[in-house]
Curated annotation (Swiss-Prot):
The record marks E152 as: Transition state stabilizer. It comes from Helicobacter hepaticus (strain ATCC 51449 / 3B1). The gene is pdxJ. One of its GO terms (molecular function) is pyridoxine 5'-phosphate synthase activity. Belongs to the PNP synthase family. Its EC number is 2.6.99.2. Catalyzes the complicated ring closure reaction between the two acyclic compounds 1-deoxy-D-xylulose-5-phosphate (DXP) and 3-amino-2-oxopropyl phosphate (1-amino-acetone-3-phosphate or AAP) to form pyridoxine 5'-phosphate (PNP) and inorganic phosphate. It is an enzyme of class 2 (transferase). This is Pyridoxine 5'-phosphate synthase. 3-amino-2-oxopropyl phosphate binds at N8, R19, G220, G241, H242. Homooctamer; tetramer of dimers. GO terms for biological process: pyridoxine biosynthetic process. Keywords: Cytoplasm, Pyridoxine biosynthesis, Transferase.
């Protein structure tokens, strides 16, 4: 399997914070992930430190046998802190304190100057830069223009459509009303959304006029919906967290990661 799996360990820390004690330790998850065949560790250092803390970041970077990809907002203090630690990659993401999880891609146009300056800072520190974006062609062009080295395509819309179409979510109090389409319409929307992701991945990695970007994908991916995304040849990496950690409660973290790698191979 050529596509890589980055395991997001945010919710290991979420479980720890539920009791405000010292376990489970996110660092321990790093070594389990390596043994299970993960290719990378991903986590989000949020402004409110709701799960991962600064001390976690430092310990994990210093001790991890796997490459580290840190997600963060355009926050000057966080950027300075991370540049001092020099992880392999930093992925810039949008952030709202009131959100449960990241709700969409970066608004590159409105933050153009800040993103440009931040990417230059990453480059000077030898840190690979990525932008978390919605699968829109204009965002790909802007990412190229800014000098990003990679993009991660936000798969949340696809994931939510799949949940509403093929799970019991639509019959619960968690139903996503904005995705409550009739059966035929929701399947057509899934197909369109997948095509948007595939076309953006192809555009990102093309060599026309300028250097290609590496293309990753993530958000809301689970064991049922990951196969179609993993089959897009231009996507070289998936970053997945919640579904792996949720399954690990029942089967253990190592087995949950192995099962995800197997699901990524299913067409």
């Amino acid at each position: 399997m050529s596509i890589r799996l980055g395991v997001n360990i945010d919710h290991i820390a979420t479980l720890r914070e539920a009791r405000a004690i010292y376990e489970p330790d996110p660092l321990e998850a790093v070594f389990i992930a390596k043994n299970a065949g993960a290719h990378q560790i991903t986590f989000h250092l949020r402004e409110d430190r709701r799960h991962i803390h600064d001390s976690d970041v430092k310990r994990i970077i210093q001790s991890s046998p796997l490459p580290i990809n840190i997600e963060c907002a355009l926050d000057e203090k966080i950027i300075d802190y991370l540049c001092g630690l020099k992880p392999q990659r930093i992925t810039l993401v949008p952030e709202k304190r009131e959100e449960i999880t990241t709700e969409g891609g970066l608004d590159i146009e409105s933050r153009y100057d800040s993103i440009r300056d931040t990417l230059k800072a990453f480059e000077s520190c030898g840190i690979v830069s990525a932008l978390f974006i919605d699968p829109k062609k204009e965002s790909i062009f802007l990412a190229r223009e800014l000098g990003a080295q990679a993009v991660e395509l936000h798969t949340g819309r696809y994931a939510n459509l799949m949940l509403m179409a093929y799970s019991n979510l639509s019959r619960t109090h968690r139903a996503l009303e904005e995705f409550a389409f009739p059966t035929q319409e929701i399947n057509e929307e899934i197909s369109r959304t997948l095509d948007d992701i595939a076309q953006c991945a192809k555009l990102a990695t093309s060599t026309i006029d300028t250097r290609p970007l590496e293309c990753f994908a993530g958000h809301g991916l689970n064991y049922q919906n990951v196969g179609a995304i993993a089959q897009i040849p231009q996507i070289s990496e998936l970053n997945i967290g919640h579904s792996i950690i949720a399954r690990s409660v029942f089967v253990g973290l190592e087995r949950a990661i192995i099962q995800m790698r197997e699901a990524m191979c299913q067409k």
